[in-house]
């Protein structure tokens, strides 16, 4: 009987030890759940994209949209990389005094030709990238390394407003983006009410993309803005394209009343 008791006690002790060891092993194998919460944002092409619920490091390829994100979000804290030309909207402008963080944004990940250095973007911890809607190849490459992408565009006022809402959803600032669109609609109605396009004596307005004399006002919402504002776009009928350029001699010939650009590069044309 004593031997049986001893064997039983030994067996129970062994089982307890095995159980303890298994418990330790299970605890060691358990890793903290680091899966980030996500949400779905539908971009301008209708792609349903899973993005971080709380996006923190955004790369923005479209030049003016770095400023758009600042306007919707209220700061540049969640911006990480921007197009080099986008910095021209910051340096020497009112934004320079309001947001010191903007000056620290990376301007090398995104090249002048709008391409994205995929490896650098991944190393920089970019968690979402905003691209023009024609950048499908860049979007595919970024997605493969785990960086979700949203495609936007501003060829028409409708797509411009949709893109505002897309960015608002990304930032969790849908109401603010909607208010910006409402403000646009209100202002637009006031301008249209003046029916300035019916004037016979209209100023000619040349709108350029940059100092390389690439056209802009003929292939995006600026064409409509020029029209309802009472201006005449001499290149309004030119087939829209991102690479469409004109010669300086052509500008002399047209002698437009107004030359404008969305970017600071236009300053180079003053002379």
Where are these regions (language model features)?
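A short, structured surface patch at a secondary-structure boundary
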Residues: 66-120, 128, 234
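Proline-aspartate-enriched helix->loop->beta-strand connector
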Residues: 110, 118-131, 147, 247-261
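Extracytoplasmic substrate-binding proteins
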Residues: 138-214, 235-237, 245
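Bacterial Sec-exported substrate-binding components of ABC uptake systems
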Residues: 2-4, 23-68, 175-206
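Short helix-initiation/N-cap motifs at beta->coil->alpha
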Residues: 44-46, 105-119, 239-248
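Bacterial Sec-type N-terminal signal peptides, specifically the leucine/valine-rich hydrophobic h-region
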Residues: 18-21
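Alpha-helical, coiled-coil/dimerization segments enriched in small aliphatic residues
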Residues: 217-243, 247
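Bacterial N-terminal signal peptides that target proteins for export
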Residues: 1-11
